[in-house]
Amino acid sequence: MKKMPFILKFAYIRVNALRFGRIFLETAFKIGRPIIGHPSKTASKSYHFFLTEATYAPWKVDSEFQEVYKMLPTRSVALGEVQLYDLWNSVKSVKKIDGDIMEVGVWRGTSLALLGYASQKYSPNKKIHGFDTFSGVALASENDPLYVGGEHADTSEKIVRDVLAGANVTNAELHIGIYPMDTSEKTPQKISLAHIDVDTYDSTILSLERLWGNASIGARIVCTDYGSCTATGVPPAVEKFVNDHDNAILGYSIGGSGIVQKISL
């Protein structure tokens, strides 16, 4: 009988270890969830810790993505590597869609720098628009049990501009204030891609409602907080918006982002 190659044996060991770890962690989560609890009983049923055997990780071997990812300052990285790869691929996917790129919720500028870098590479004629209060989370309500407002205020316009300069991004504009109440008029006339990272129900749905009319057919709106266990107001906001608009479809990315796409006028 032919012996199994060592590398294949090693792979089987890793897969079995992953399966054991998954069972252990999922069991621990099921036991611990009722004990720890969650501010929202409804939300607690919608979140689950899991491991997967689908371990293909194209972002690890995408040299162009890794080049810009490694130049981003670690202190400013709010999103994980996989979520940033979602944005990277989104810029590439809308390169033939008419319209600029915008981000609501810039924080310290990491994702805005990635969007700017990618757009300069794949869609050099598009402008990048960043919207932020620079004073923390806005419009927290009873729909956001883990937020009171003002979180993530450890940023400034200067910090963001320095991050943009470090990534050699020259096509970005910053707009300061609560979007859309304070800066609605700065919304691009045509939008091919929007990234919404605002943590709360009201900020999410108001941003979607305002920019949707300017979104081109085929445009993507990436809602990073959709899968976050802390921003529990975001999924119902995104889902309500999609349910209310026949020309919107919703997808869920490997990075946990909710991706809304416009399929018709």
Enumerate the predicted regions with their spans.
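S-adenosylmethionine/decaboxylated-SAM
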Residues: A54, P58-A78, W88, K95-L265
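N-terminal pre-P-loop "Q-motif" helix
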Residues: V82-D86
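Membrane-proximal basic amphipathic "stem/tether" segments
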Residues: M1-T74
